[in-house]
């Protein structure tokens, strides 16, 4: 069983470390690495601007996004019939793919990029 969980453990560690970096890459919101200020410069702390769709949802939102991004990694780690190294690579690739999918949906829902029309989500 340890062999099945190891790819998830590696990808989950990478997800936890670089989650906020990918948030900034998607939304250009001002978030920085955990060791360089994290969300201290995120636009969620500024008035009268579009707020980062991930950071604006608080701890519950972070938890939901992390669960949505990590669930496919866990499934791939446990159920795919490939060798351990291949599953590690696939699980690591699922991190940015999951963040783009979840972040994209939240950004569209919130009207973050402004090309969908009126904001329909929470401000």
Protein language model regions, located:
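Membrane-helix interface and helix-disruption motif detector
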Residues: 53-58, 85, 112-119
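Cytoplasmic juxtamembrane regions at transmembrane-helix boundaries
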Residues: 1-5, 67-97
